[in-house]
Amino acid sequence: MAEPRVFLKENRGRIEENYLEQAKNLPRVFAPVDEKLQKCTEEVALACKYLYAFMPYSDIGNYPFEVFLDYAENGVRLWKENPQVADLPEEIFLNYVLFHRVNEEEIAQCRTYFRAEIGSRIQGMNFREAALEVNYWCAEEATYHCTDDRTLSAISVYRRGNGRCGEESVFTVNALRSVGVPARQVYAPKWSHCDDNHAWVEIWCDGKWYFLGACEPEEILNKGWFTNASSRAMMIHSRVFDTKIPEGEVIGTDGMVTMLNELKRYAVTKEITVTVKDTQGLPAEGAEVSFEVLNYSEYAPIAEKKTDSKGTARLTTGFGSLHISARMCSDGEWFYAETVMNTEKEDNCELCLVSQDKRNDGESEKWTAADIFAPHDAPVNTDMPTLEQKAKGNKRLAAANVHREQKVRNWSNPECERFLGKKVNRIEEAIAASYREDLLGVLTEKDRTDCISDVLEEHLELAIPYHGMMKKDTFVSYVLNPRVDDEVLQKYRREIKKHFSRAEKQELRDDPSRIWNLIEKAIVSRPEKERSSVITTPAGCIRTCTGSFLSKKILFVAIARTLGVAARLNPHDRSMEYMKNGRFVPVLARTEKNCTLILKAGETVQWKYFQNWSIAKLENGRYTSLKLGAENFEDQILNLPLESGNYRILTSNRLPNGNMFANEYHFEIQPGETKEIELVLREADLEDMLENISMPEFMLKTEDGTEVKASDLTADGKHILMFLEEEKEPTEHILNEMMEQEEAFAGYAEQIIFVVRSKEALETPTLSKALAKLKNIQIYYDDFSEIINTLGRRMYVDPDKLPLIIVTNGTLNGIYATSGYNVGTGDMLLRLM
């Protein structure tokens, strides 16, 4: 007779040990947790202890025990009832079934609910089959929607029916884990071929990891719209919160989180070596090396390593360009070095550290060019569904879309309605009632979909006494407003108020900078126990007496607002500010904006921040980009108030083939100084823009419904494929450009292919006029349901923007593509032909 299984037998000891360490560090918080654990079964208590042992301090401070109990109880039930789950290696179960956190999302109870919704649909299925089925359920409940950077909880994505890719994948991972399928989120932190990033999901079955697109179901695993894009990535990573690290290449840590390199599953890779030397030319052991890609016109880190005793660091990456920087602190002084490396041609590079303070010596204040190359398209995951599977999947996806659209059609957050609809009985409440819509109005669209009425009530009730002490817009934005940054919206004002006597409150109002002094004394930062992007709420900081530097800055603003002092984090650099004599002043003297940079735009370029330029400040051996908002050039001039220090301006020209022409300008600005710099964007030649991308075969139809292969249409020489959306402005623009250059385009008319949805499109005014002028253009038909998306993704342009225009040179060989309307597209097409 077999011995009964023991829950977490192999890891029980280390779980208990790590839990006790957490409890020892935060005794006040863990005392009530211990009491509640005593009421749980042995297995559930151990599961809870695992969560508490390896969660960030921010989770401990932000959420009550009952939230984590849902995850623990569901995990234990799966282990007891599902033999597949019980047979999992313990580390897989702990990290990828039981654990509550996926990335940096808000945590809310969801697992038990999701299991109840999904469980009956996957009865009798193995993990592979269940993963595919769960993803169809996810598509029925949520789809992509561009939103702000705060990451919703999985249950909020489910309720509102949409989220950005990072939220869709958080939702899908939670859905998979809820029914026992081991799952994790993986990220291309930044693409190399375009300005964006992407997150998707991996599931573990048959002893290995497979991928799928979150809320984007397919009939097979290892297929998604991003399959080709991921082959051009320089890094794809996963993360683990446990201290017992799985096998794999560690590419950095974010506090308590370890990042793992997953690129080999998606792309052709190689190992590169970076050697760092100190100012004496000797190996710099312990230097921090940052590997970065140029994205949104800033160098964004994708991996970080420390050098060994020989001063070397190694990384497995793709075949493209990396910006590599190194930093090191010695005797309180920071040293820095940087270079650009094309890994397609180079295996090694060397960096020589120099003092950060001597980085800009005056002679270096000039524009320096850098050529940034994106990896070539080289897919390693080539599995495709059969025609039968594809047809089945299309039918199921269409049904999922109908279900979801019906669900969200008239959805709104009932908590907002409850908050707005509260009955008013007294004069004081009547005053507060007038600010209810103002409070909701100052929140983001995302906030309004997951805010809680009781939370808003406390903020309104305790802020309203200060409403007459300042201008209304100042009061609403910087006192009443419950949001400071991207923290979870929770109550905190009553908790803060009870910590101070009446006299102390007045002293802090008289000199708000003293609030920071109190925070520095009372709140300890433990970065090794946190994840930098997961914020401890103001109330959580007070409960645990811990918080990251950002969390403490948010606490400063929260205390100030609670006391009726208008305060904020500066939107450019997140420095703390409070209002004094009608203007915001810095809390810390070192963040005072005591210099002015005058940027000149020139005549020909439309400058857009984080699109073709950015500016970053060098501090502690690391450049950090300023978060400029809607600042616009007036009369070709932009005035930027800055702190004194060393800066780097980047300009970048992204080419259609994914490569970039970059320009760098390093400078130092002194207190009181005004400096003028003219922005310069590098221009590209035609040959720099072209690609050679093999497009998949697809079919178009003639007027009588006969199917024609695209390979036949593109067989001889160059062609222009134009998928048109008649009577829509972007399509009208390109048609007008073509008619304005009628003579030039007429010479290529037989090589131009217009694709429309119906014959009626040809009768619309602008399109019919264009066809009359350019008589030999070929006309074909498609319903735009699938081909548009496939070709747009394949050519690395936005498939949701029409017209989609592709220039081919030879059979199904795409050399150029654009989507939507861009000024000068007509001229570009003529140059290409």
Question: What feature does the model see in each segment?
Answer:
Residues 2, 116, 120-136, 145-156, ...:
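Hydrophobic/aromatic-rich core segments of domains that either
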Residues 3-160, 390, 395-544, 554:
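Secondary-structure boundary elements
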Residues 270-281, 595-605:
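A short, amphipathic beta-strand motif
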Residues 312-325, 329-331, 340-343, 632-657, ...:
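Short Pro-Gly-centered beta-turn/loop motif in secreted/extracellular proteins
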Residues 768-802:
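Short, internal strand/loop/helix patches
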Residues 799-820:
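A short, hydrophobic beta-strand/beta-hairpin element that forms part of a small beta-sheet core
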